[in-house]
Amino acid sequence: MAAKDLKFGNDARKKMLKGVNILANAVKVTLGPKGRNVVLDKSYGAPSITKDGVSVARDIELEDKFENMGAQMLKEVASKANDAAGDGTTTATVLAQSIVTEGLKAVAAGMNPMDLKRGIDKAVDAAVEELKKLSKPCKDSKEIAQVGTISANADEKVGTLISDAMKRVTNEGVITVEEASGLEDGLIVVEGMQFDRGYLSPYFINKQESSSIEFDNPYILLVDKKISNIRDMLSILEVVAKEGKPLLIIAEDVEGEALATLVVNTMRGIVKVAAVKAPGFGDRRKEMLQDIAVLTHGHVISEETGDSLEKATQENLGKAKRVVITKDATTIIDGAGEKSRIEARVQNIRKQIENATSDYDKEKLQERVAKLSGGVAVIKVGAPTEIAMKEKKARVEDALQATRAAVEEGVVPGGGVALIRVASKIANSSLKGDNEDQNVGIRVALRAMESPLRQIVVNAGEEASVIANKVKENKGNDNYGYNAQTEAYGDMIEMGILDPTKVTRSALQYAASIAGLMITTECMVTDLPKEEKASDMGSGGMGGMGGMNGMM
């Protein structure tokens, strides 16, 4: 076991605070409409440019191990805020730095760290309740666009795209962000159910100009196994040929003789057929086949339930108004399923989401809900260079998560104003600690709540104290604040400067939680650096060569 290096008391806390300040100072330059970018070096390729707090934090490692522990704990604040609400990472970092700095000053002055933490926790609990009172629902498309605009660094086009996407596919729909091939941003909405499986043979293509297959009013055969023998499908193919309707086969796989026969019959014009692999793997594939069955009023042919493909009838086939198949994706539009069955299926999946433990499972279940109910929207992000593209894509993804948070818990006035209002209300309330040290903890938290506004103002090149005091005057309007972009005072909601309540709440709670742990730290332990032993390369003479000098 490696030997350890230990630091205690103020020595430990000073080192930790130094690490906190290094990371926070790098992150907080990005805050607000006039925040700056940070350039991150990469081990290969071009550096990346970002204005996203958590991206900056994740990239920082310090050489001094004690300082690095402080930086890593602060990094956790940004990561937790990002995981919870998708935004507010820089705000959380600024709040945590302020709480740690003021808290450690109080500890150095002789206050009890545990009581300080209890005071901070009391102030934060009260602040969360006040934020809920200040919050307003966000259902209007205009407000959703404003939240997206603010989160995307005042990019109005991005805010509008996100608002349009949410309107088209509902709040539960899947919205993804992809890189565009050109310079322009755009929105593509896929109606119906789409899954990422394309045609098994290009010979099925019937639209040469788009290299795709398009069927109107097709039958849909769903099979939970590989199909390799064409004889298993003869009865179904006869029914389809007689009716003159196209057939889409969705199975685990279609291979060998079965695929070859389908291709030949399609090319001869005997039947219109296309085959694709079922989406997903394992149990997830079975569930997704059931989703398609419910959507199309079909039945999954599965040996597990005693079904046989040979005995399948027309009653087992699903139907849809239209199907479009490309080499990468299959889209089923306007399935013939009953609305009540689809809704029941959606409710069932929602219950699974509530019980799911992993983020991956939740995401996949959410996608299934969206495909059954809302559809899928793709926001295409364009930029002139790859570096700009990556930076913009990250901003749009943040903005998308922020708008979802706004719809979930509502909005509060942005620009750091909500926390200023909350702090003022708590300061004027009857909130008190059990002792004077707890009261100091409450004051530490309330002072920290001013720090986001102050940092936004500093980044805009203005005097923080003057503007903070003017905003505190309130003028009888809780929404009264300072617009750093236009350098004007006014109603933040009317000016379109909104923050999702969830983002502000999460930033404050995670900042206070981690900062409280740092304040109560008394000892830090790390591995001692290993000393590299220089290999013994000095010549001590070679055995048996003692008389070499005399050879000359």
UniProtKB/Swiss-Prot annotation:
Q: Name one GO biological process term.
A: protein refolding
UniProt EC number = 5.6.1.7
Whose protein is this, by species?
A: Hamiltonella defensa subsp. Acyrthosiphon pisum (strain 5AT)
Q: Which residues bind ATP?
A: T30, L31, G32, P33, K51, D87, G88, T89, T90, T91, G415, D499
State the oligomer form and interacting partners. Forms a cylinder of 14 subunits composed of two heptameric rings stacked back-to-back. Interacts with the co-chaperonin GroES.
Using the UniProt record, give the first listed, main subcellular location: cytoplasm
Q: What is this protein called?
A: Chaperonin GroEL
- Family named by the database record: Belongs to the chaperonin (HSP60) family.
What reaction does this enzyme carry out catalytically?
ATP + H2O + a folded polypeptide = ADP + phosphate + an unfolded polypeptide
Q: Name the gene that codes for it.
A: groEL
Q: Which UniProt keywords apply?
A: ATP-binding, Chaperone, Cytoplasm, Isomerase, Nucleotide-binding
